[in-house]
Amino acid sequence: MAQITLSATVQPQQMGQRLDQTLAELFPDYSRSRLKTWIEEDLVLVNGVVQNVPRTKVYGDEHIEITVEIEDETRFEPENIPLNIVYEDDDILVINKPKDLVVHPGAGNPKGTVLNALLYHYPQIAEVPRAGIVHRLDKDTTGLMVVAKTIPAQTQLVRDLQKRKITREYEAVACGIMTKGGTVDEPMARHPTKRTHMAVHPMGKPAVTHYRIMERFRDYTRLRLRLETGRTHQIRVHMAHIAHPLLGDQTYGGRPRPPKNASEELMAVLRNFKRQALHAVMLRLQHPINGEMMEWYAPLPDDFVELVTALKADYVLHKDELDY
């Protein structure tokens, strides 16, 4: 078991909410049922006083503190899975995750994950909640992730994520020809009928994605995106919501379609690109222990480079036929 302390301040816009609902928003890494249990077990302090009634209303600006014992991750099997380490010190490591690698074990993926690899290469990380994983990438999204090697580092990184102090930027290829960048500010929640999907929903959690155009091709647009929040599938759902799903994203409507009179080469590349075209290209954060500002970049993976190269060659071949 490992002891952790979570702390946060109730925001003014949360005034009138139930305590358990507020905690779910302040500490999104933990389930609402777990947070409710902690309330009922006298583990939640509100302005220094134990509060054990989940339906209690909050008023804004209260200081919340929770000190709990968390099960370590020894129930998962360590596995000798290679990790591409971009940076490492005593407190954190940054990895460049490949495609086809799930971050955390779950239904349908009991092993063969980033977490299993971390337990093998860093046995002591079993003492850290979630083996130090503070944010995730989807199975077929590539790129940068930060992992905490100690409980103090994990606690601070989670806090910084909640305060939106960690910058995460992505490159993507979206379906359709986009004319300008912008921001998608639409709340998100679990899809009402497809439980493995997410959806824009007026009663969901706040979700904000900024995007700008890097390059236009025939029928596709290359984007640079920045997450202001970090909801599950956020970029994929937001881009689909504005009718520009990510190329290759079968879940949210981005099935590749070759442009008119496309070359055999481009059609082959599109046919063989069997994931969403999304890569976590940049990560910027303040070191959780020494406070140093740090920044990393991950080059596009080979399949993404091949995709962009083929789309660019097709655009050059047909640009005289275009009116944009």
Residue ranges and their predicted role:
Residues 2-324:
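RNA pseudouridine synthases
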